[in-house]
Amino acid sequence: MSKIIFMGTPDFSTKVLEMLIAEHEVIAVVTQPDRPVGRKKVMTPPPVKRVATKHQIPVYQPEKLKDSQELDVLLSLESDLIVTAAFGQLLPESLLNAPKLGAINVHASLLPKYRGGAPIHQAIIDGEEETGITIMYMVKKLDAGNIISQQSIRIEEEDNVGTMHDKLSFLGAELLKKTLPSIIDNTNDSIPQDDALATFASNIRREDERIDWNMSAQAIHNHIRGLSPWPVAYTTMNEKNLKLFSAFIVKGKKGNPGTIIEATKHELIIATGSDDAIALTEIQPAGKKRMKVTDYLSGVQESLVGKVLL
C-alpha cells in the first residue's frame, strides 16, 4: 500500500482526504493553521484537520511550509506520493521531488484554464457553462504540470459557488480514485499543458466583490452567483453595505444603472447597464442576518423605488 502525504485545507479537500484514508495509507496531513472565525474570533481548525484528527493521522500546520521545521519532518517520511487539493501554499521544490511517485494536485478547473486559487468563482463569474476537475503532476510553476486526467461537468444557470463547490469536491474524489492506480503503477500517459491557452483565477479581493451596476444584467447575475454564498457580492444603499446572495434576470426592464425601478412582494428590481434588469431575491442588510427580500420588505416603511445602489 502506497504511503501518501495529503495537503489541503477547506471543505473541498475533505472528500479527497476521506477517499484516500479509505483506499490507501495516509501517513501525514498538512493543512493551514487554525484561524479566528466569526465575531468572537474563536480559533477554528480547518476542515481537513478535523478529518485527520478523527482518523488519528499526524497533522502539521506550518504558517509557511518553506524553511519550516515541518518541511524537514515531511522530507524524512519517505513517502511514495504527495496529494494536494486546495492546500493554499506553494510547495518547495525539495518537497515536490521527494516522493518516489512525485506530487499530484486535484484542481477544480479544466486546466490550462483557470490556474490559481479561485477557479470555481472565476468560471461562474465569466459565464462559463462547463468546468471540471484536473488531476495533474505538480511542478514549481503554479498549476502548470502535466495533465494526468480530466472530467468535465456542466454549470447550470441556477448554480452558484456553493453548489458547484459541492459537485466538484465529490467529482474530485471520484476522479482521483479512478486515476490513482495508473499513478501508482506509473502507467499513466500524462500530457503537457499548452501555456498559450492558460487563463488565471486569482484569489478574490475585496474590491472584486462590489457590484458595478453599469455592467449588463447577465454579467451582474454571474457575478452574484460567482460569489455566493462566499465571499458574497455587495452593493451600498443609503451608504450601508448590502450583501447580495441570489437574483435573477428580468428581461426588458430599463432605467438608470443601479436604480431600484420596482419593489414587488418578493423582489427588488434594479436597473443595469443593459436593456434587462436584476431582481434581487435574497440579501443581507448591514448588521442583520441573511434573509429573503420578502422578509426585508415587510420591515421597511418607506418606498425604495428610485433609490440608487452604488
Swiss-Prot record:
Family matches, as InterPro entries: Fmt (IPR005794), Formyl_trans_C (IPR005793), Formyl_trans_C_sf (IPR037022), Formyl_transf_N (IPR002376), Formyl_transf_N_sf (IPR036477), Formyl_transferase-like_C_sf (IPR011034), GART_AS (IPR001555), Met-tRNA-FMT_C (IPR044135)
One protein family per Pfam: Formyl_trans_N
EC number: 2.1.2.9
GO CC annotation: cytosol
Keyword entries, A-Z: Protein biosynthesis, Transferase
GO molecular function: methionyl-tRNA formyltransferase activity
Record-listed (6S)-5,6,7,8-tetrahydrofolate binding positions: 109-112
Catalytic activity: L-methionyl-tRNA(fMet) + (6R)-10-formyltetrahydrofolate = N-formyl-L-methionyl-tRNA(fMet) + (6S)-5,6,7,8-tetrahydrofolate + H(+)
Physiological role: Attaches a formyl group to the free amino group of methionyl-tRNA(fMet). The formyl group appears to play a dual role in the initiator identity of N-formylmethionyl-tRNA by promoting its recognition by IF2 and preventing the misappropriation of this tRNA by the elongation apparatus.
Record-linked NCBIfam families: fmt (TIGR00460)
The family this protein is said to belong to: Belongs to the Fmt family.
The name this protein goes by in its record: Methionyl-tRNA formyltransferase
Organism: Staphylococcus epidermidis (strain ATCC 35984 / DSM 28319 / BCRC 17069 / CCUG 31568 / BM 3577 / RP62A)
Gene name in the database record: fmt
